[in-house]
Amino acid sequence: MLHALLQPASAYAVVLDAGSSGTRAHVFRFQARPGHTPMLLAKPSVLKHSPGLSAFADQPAKAARQVEALIHWAQTLVPAGQRRDTPVVLLATAGLRLLAAQRGEAAAEAVLDACRPVLIDSQFLFRDDWAHILPGADEGAFAWAR
């Protein structure tokens, strides 16, 4: 038992970066040990689907289908036993910010609202507020993920 406590465990995180040209799923794998800072084990696995979610403003269900395809791919990388402990976030950037500016917040929120049920049903750890439009000032803080 002591040996198991000393062994670092793998932990995962899934970040959906919904940009203007497409949505990228980033699957991060960390070394996690209680009391230690998690360490990234390798470059994240990344898959991009185009176009950006804002292209589906008039058909939000298509945005949900795009997110669903990315989630299915991420599920192949995260062991089934770890999915419930793996957070998934959907961070929308320039495309949905522009949609909100041009057609109103409700148009952008409708796209996110269509995607939330996919994330809830994904087997990953998700809360509704983890799918949101990232303010431009905060976007730079996530540049390391690209």
Labelled PLM ranges:
Residues 1-20, 26-146:
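Nucleotide/phosphate-binding catalytic cleft detector across ATP-hydrolyzing
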